[in-house]
């Protein structure tokens, strides 16, 4: 049983949670227990010190990020040595992304090298063309969906990238984790991984620059 669980969200108000207050006792979990609620980008957890947590859980977040490798490296930073992470992303075949191509790891590496920010709209054209609105009850008409996408910086509905298990495994491994277990269920991909001392991503970037 965890002594304390804290939470992070990207804004003070979201479509999914409503109004969120950053404070020491506003993150509710396991009934009446309370932890600290942080408001921060997944790629910039500047209020959280290194090696702070024994475990980290990310569920259906990574696909919404323009720079997933940057986020994974930041998550690794705040996990203690030998700590673990559980990362969950949707399987593309179970979502409105099923018509889109699976993202390649070289694309994620390129985003990391360029330090792509969360306002990036590189994938907008692909999303407008291939997003299956029949599987997205909140998409509305094409024009309504397009407007929602254009406002992604504030609403974060958009799936920037499309994962399969191979991509998720490679991304987690590159960012300094050892994959301990993989599982697919209920339309989601699950990876359990332990923090390693080495970060292969750094070596990959260095090789690309030489």
Over which residues does each language-model region extend?
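Class I SAM-dependent methyltransferase SAM/SAH-binding core
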Residues: 1-45
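S-adenosyl-L-methionine-dependent methyltransferase catalytic module, highlighting the catalytic core
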Residues: 29-32, 69-74, 84-207
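Short, flexible active-site loop motifs that bind/organize anionic cofactors or intermediates
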Residues: 35, 58-61, 158
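A short acidic, Gly/Pro-enriched loop at the edge of an enzyme's catalytic core
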Residues: 40-56
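Active-site micro-motifs of SAM-dependent methyltransferase domains
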Residues: 44, 63, 94
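Surface-exposed loop/turn positions
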Residues: 52, 82-83
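A short SAM/SAH-binding and catalytic strip from SAM-dependent methyltransferases
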Residues: 54-66
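Helix-to-beta-strand junctions that scaffold the AdoMet/dcAdoMet cofactor pocket
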Residues: 65-66, 79-81
């Amino acid at each position: 049983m965890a002594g304390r669980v804290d939470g992070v969200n990207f804004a003070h108000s979201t479509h999914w949670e409503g109004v969120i207050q950053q404070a020491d006792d506003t993150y509710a979990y396991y009934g009446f227990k309370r932890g600290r609620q942080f408001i921060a980008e997944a790629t910039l957890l500047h209020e959280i010190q290194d090696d702070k947590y024994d475990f980290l859980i990310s569920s259906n977040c990574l696909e919404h990020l323009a720079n997933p490798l940057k986020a994974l490296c930041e998550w690794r930073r705040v996990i203690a040595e030998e700590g673990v992470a559980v990362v969950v992303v949707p399987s593309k075949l179970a979502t409105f992304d099923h018509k889109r191509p699976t993202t390649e790891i070289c694309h994620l590496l390129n985003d990391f090298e360029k330090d792509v920010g969360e306002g990036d709209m590189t994938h907008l054209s692909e999303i407008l063309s291939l997003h299956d609105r029949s599987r997205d009850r909140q998409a509305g008409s094409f024009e309504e969906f397009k407007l929602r996408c254009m406002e992604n910086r504030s609403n974060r509905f958009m799936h920037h990238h499309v994962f399969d298990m191979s991509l998720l495994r490679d991304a987690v491994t590159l960012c300094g984790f050892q994959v301990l277990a993989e599982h697919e269920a209920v339309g989601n991909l699950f990876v359990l991984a332990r923090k390693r001392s080495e970060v292969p991503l750094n070596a990959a970037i260095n090789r690309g620059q030489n």
